[in-house]
């Protein structure tokens, strides 16, 4: 399997390394394309990554390998990528490419070869989750193309330009067949930090879905949300390059001592052990928004439950945070046996269930009740700790809605499903509506 290194210049010096980052030469960034994509998709990163050498993997059936059948295999890709492992390197895969990069990293581990410094996953469902678009692989051409244009950012010209359709359709069919046939095989999590990049306007793989990548590492996880849609790597490469080069120069996801600077439209969430020593971010007691003015005018909220802590940081304004595990509450279990809610039920200020929420619990399938209750209670606690007015007495109208949930007085609640060494958990962050870009650092050490 051939690999086509991109010819790059080095007009800027290497980024200043963090004291905890690996010493030595600047790393290579090995990039795997999205379905239907090719090495050329990464030309935008070439001039934006400074001293980081961008190496784009060319899959068969595209660009300079157009004459080859468009099928590939992970073992053959790993054979060629292995030649780059003698120097520091990182893997980046976008959409389908992220799933390929994940499997390449696992195959390198099986072979006892040096692991990447990072696994970067862009706009991709976690490998243990189904890809909804995979169902389009068997559709007739017109319907297949329509789905890709509407949902995956494929060019409109695919509908109307016969030459482009003739060129790309065999590659797209082959790639989506690979996605459809892919089966995740459980193995221990990677000892490689994982950084997931989501597109703010990507309805196919929203940022919350990408938090599931935390299940697949025990070396730290981060999520960053970029402006753009599903193919932000094509249209927003400068921002992506800035985040990657800064990360490679730093200590790794979740290893810093301060939250990253947040912008006006951004909220940063950090998840860490509740017994983290004093003096580190989020180590103060309490759960109020504290509106503590930090550097740059940012405010912070902290909450603890079940051995976990969550810290939310915004720039300006107020913010509230809450975290919990499903086993922490008993109303869902009571509902299974026909109990009534009673007055003032709830384990903390502001998190009692409303009558409408209780009715939803009673009507829900028994296995869904703990999570639905957790969503209602954490949402209410986050709002209360932000200083927002409590939700209307009836409660939230749809506990199964993905969020953000609109709340009273112009507030909203965003949920983060968490995958931590203590098990599955849920964080809720309350903020004024309009602050939409999520970034997160999640503790995953086992």
Predicted regions and their residues:
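Domain-scale detector for complete catalytic domains at protein termini or as standalone homologs
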Residues: 1-92, 99-255
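Aromatic-acidic/polar surface patches that form glycan- and anion
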Residues: 94, 233, 371-375
């Amino acid at each position: 399997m051939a690999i086509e290194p991109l010819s790059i210049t080095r007009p800027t010096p290497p980024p200043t390394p963090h004291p905890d980052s690996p010493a030595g030469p600047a790393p290579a960034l090995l990039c795997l394309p999205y379905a239907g994509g090719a090495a050329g998709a990464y030309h935008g990163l070439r001039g934006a990554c400074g001293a980081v050498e961008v190496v784009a993997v060319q899959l068969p059936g595209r660009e300079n390998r157009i004459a080859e059948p468009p099928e590939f295999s992970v073992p053959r890709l790993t054979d060629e990528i292995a030649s780059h492992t003698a120097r520091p390197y990182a893997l980046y895969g976008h959409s389908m490419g992220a799933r390929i990069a994940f499997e390449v990293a696992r195959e390198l581990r099986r072979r006892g070869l040096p692991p990447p410094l990072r696994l970067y996953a862009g706009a991709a469902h976690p490998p243990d989750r189904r890809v909804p678009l995979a169902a389009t692989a068997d559709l007739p051409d017109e319907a297949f193309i329509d789905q890709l244009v509407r949902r995956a950012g494929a060019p409109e010209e695919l509908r109307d330009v016969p030459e482009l359709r003739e060129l790309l359709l065999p590659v797209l069919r082959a790639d989506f067949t690979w996605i459809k046939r892919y089966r995740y095989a459980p193995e221990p999590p990677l000892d490689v930090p994982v950084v997931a990049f989501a597109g703010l306007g990507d309805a196919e793989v929203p940022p919350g879905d990408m938090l599931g990548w935390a299940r697949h590492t025990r070396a730290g996880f981060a999520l960053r949300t970029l402006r753009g849609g599903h193919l932000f790597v094509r249209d927003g490469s400068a921002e992506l390059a800035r985040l990657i080069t800064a990360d490679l120069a730093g200590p790794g996801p979740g290893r810093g001592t301060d939250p990253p600077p947040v912008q006006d439209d951004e909220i940063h969430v950090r998840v860490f052990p509740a017994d983290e020593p004093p003096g580190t971010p989020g180590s103060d007691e309490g759960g109020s928004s504290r509106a503590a003015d930090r550097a740059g005018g940012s405010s912070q909220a902290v909450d603890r439950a079940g051995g976990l802590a969550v810290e939310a940081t915004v720039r300006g304004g107020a913010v509230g945070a809450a975290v919990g595990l499903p086993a922490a509450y008993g109303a869902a279990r009571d509902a299974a046996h026909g109990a009534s809610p009673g007055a003032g039920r709830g384990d903390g200020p502001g998190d009692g269930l409303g009558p409408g929420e209780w009715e939803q619990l009673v009507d829900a399938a028994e296995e869904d009740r703990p999570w639905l209750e957790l969503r209602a209670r954490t949402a209410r606690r986050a709002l209360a700790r932000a200083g927002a007015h409590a939700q209307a007495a009836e409660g939230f109208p749809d506990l199964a809605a993905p969020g953000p949930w609109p709340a009273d007085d112009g507030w909203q609640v965003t949920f983060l499903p968490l995958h931590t060494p203590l098990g599955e958990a849920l964080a809720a962050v309350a903020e004024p509506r309009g602050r939409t870009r999520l970034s997160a650092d999640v503790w995953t050490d086992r």
